[in-house]
UniProtKB/Swiss-Prot annotation:
Any one Gene Ontology cellular component term annotated for this protein: cytosolic large ribosomal subunit
Gene: rplQ
Highest rank taxon of the organism: Bacteria
InterPro entries for the chain: Ribosomal_bL17, Ribosomal_bL17_CS, Ribosomal_bL17_sf
Assembly mode: Part of the 50S ribosomal subunit. Contacts protein L32.
GO molecular function, one term: structural constituent of ribosome
Family affiliation: Belongs to the bacterial ribosomal protein bL17 family.
Protein's name in the database: Large ribosomal subunit protein bL17
Keyword Ribosomal protein belongs to the record: yes
Spans through the membrane: none
NCBIfam families documented for this protein: L17
Single Gene Ontology BP annotation: translation
Source organism of the structure: Neisseria gonorrhoeae (strain ATCC 700825 / FA 1090)
Keywords tagged on the record: Ribonucleoprotein, Ribosomal protein
C-alpha cells in the first residue's frame, strides 16, 4: 500500500530526481517562466515555494540554506535581492501552474510554470 507517500517518483532514481528538480527550480527562478510536463510542474512547485519563503528572510543562515538547495550563486543573489522583497506581502502561493496542451512527440500533458507577481513584459 502506498498510503501517504509524499513525492512523485517520475520514473527516476532519487539522485536523478533531486538533480532534475534542482535544475528546474534554478531555471524557474532565473527565467520566471518555464514549460514542462504536468507531473514535473506539480512536483516543482513543492520545491520552489519554500525557496521563495526562505528568500524573504534576509539572514546569512537563510542564504546558506538557499545555496545548499540550489548550488547556484546567481540564483541565490536573485532570490534574496529581487524575488524575496517582491513577495513580502504574499503568504505562499508564489508559483502558478497552468495546463499548456500536449507535447507533439508523445502527447504528454504540458504545463506552464510561472511566478505569480511577474513584472509585465515590455
Amino acid at each position: 500500500m502506498r498510503h501517504r507517500n509524499g513525492n512523485r517518483k517520475l520514473n527516476r532514481t532519487s539522485s536523478h530526481r533531486a538533480a532534475m528538480l534542482r535544475n528546474m527550480a534554478n531555471s524557474l527562478l532565473t527565467h520566471e517562466t518555464i514549460v514542462t510536463t504536468l507531473p514535473k510542474a506539480k512536483e516543482l512547485r513543492r520545491v520552489v515555494e519554500p525557496l521563495i519563503t526562505l528568500g524573504k528572510k534576509p539572514s546569512l543562515a537563510s542564504r546558506r540554506l538557499a545555496f545548499d538547495r540550489t548550488r547556484d550563486r546567481d540564483v541565490v543573489v536573485k532570490l534574496f535581492g529581487d524575488l524575496g522583497p517582491r513577495f513580502t506581502a504574499r503568504n505562499g502561493g508564489y508559483v502558478r501552474v497552468l495546463k499548456y496542451g500536449f507535447r507533439k512527440g508523445d502527447n504528454a500533458p504540458l504545463a506552464l510554470v510561472e511566478l505569480v507577481d511577474k513584472p509585465a513584459a515590455e
